Structure formats: structure tokens, C-alpha cells
């Protein structure tokens, strides 16, 4: 039996277990509307253009900044009707029916009340 390999495996396993226990949670509890909006953002792949946290890219708008200037009605019009490179989503049932929740999530990110990262499903 190779004690050196066994010792390394044991140490690696212990580090893995302790790391998992000591690792901070990367999710935050939120209300149902915010959680629904978060799920729509992820499932409808908004992050493809606007980034995982809504901060955009060189080619696509930073939604966090945009929501500092757009009203809820203006946001809904842009998402549902489209604008410039933004395609319209009014034919997308999930987006159209969940537009208020999507706004709630992105507005919360914009205002700093909703953290970046995964969100916990409300109890």
C-alpha cells in the first residue's frame, strides 16, 4: 500500500469537504416577482447579449444603466416591440406574460437591491 498516495487523497478529500462547508453561498433570497424575473432572464437567454448580471458589453446596452433612465412603460415597449439591435419579444409568451417580473428583477439589479448571481427561490 502506498501511504504517500493515500495521504494525498485523504488530504485532498478533506480540503474538498471543508471547502464545500466553508464556501459562501452565492445565492440571495428575494420575493417571488424578482425570482420569476430572474428565471425569465436566464431561461430566455437575455444574458447572451446583456451579460449574466445585466451589465452589457461593448455591443449591447448595460441594462443596469438603462433602467436608471427608462420608465417601466418604456422598458416594456423596448422589450416587447424591440429597438435598434434589440429584437421584439411580444410573440414570446414567457416574456410577454412575465414582463412585469422581468422589469422587477432588472430594476432591482439597477437600484442595487438585488445582488448579482444566483437567487434563492422564495419559500
Swiss-Prot record:
It comes from the Bacteria. One of its GO terms (molecular function) is metal ion binding. Heme c binds at residues 46, 49-50, 86. Coiled coil: none annotated. This is Cytochrome c-555. Binds 1 heme c group covalently per subunit. Keywords: Electron transport, Heme, Iron, Metal-binding, Signal, Transport. InterPro entries: Cyt_c-like_dom, Cyt_c-like_dom_sf, Cytochrome_c550/c551-like. It holds the Pfam family Cytochrome_CBB3. Residues 1-27 form the signal peptide. It comes from Methylococcus capsulatus (strain ATCC 33009 / NCIMB 11132 / Bath). The keyword Signal applies. The keyword Iron applies.
Amino acid at each position: 500500500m502506498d501511504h504517500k498516495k493515500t495521504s494525498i487523497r485523504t488530504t485532498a478529500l478533506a480540503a474538498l469537504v471543508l471547502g464545500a462547508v466553508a464556501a459562501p453561498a452565492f445565492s440571495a433570497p428575494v420575493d417571488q416577482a424578482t425570482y420569476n424575473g430572474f428565471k425569465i432572464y436566464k431561461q430566455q437567454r437575455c444574458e447572451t447579449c446583456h451579460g449574466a448580471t445585466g451589465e452589457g458589453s461593448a455591443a449591447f446596452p448595460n441594462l443596469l444603466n438603462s433602467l436608471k433612465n427608462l420608465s417601466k412603460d418604456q422598458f416594456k415597449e423596448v422589450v416587447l416591440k424591440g429597438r435598434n439591435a434589440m429584437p421584439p419579444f411580444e410573440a414570446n409568451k414567457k416574456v410577454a406574460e412575465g414582463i412585469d417580473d422581468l422589469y422587477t428583477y432588472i430594476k432591482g439589479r439597477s437600484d442595487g437591491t438585488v445582488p448579482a448571481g444566483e437567487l434563492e427561490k422564495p419559500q
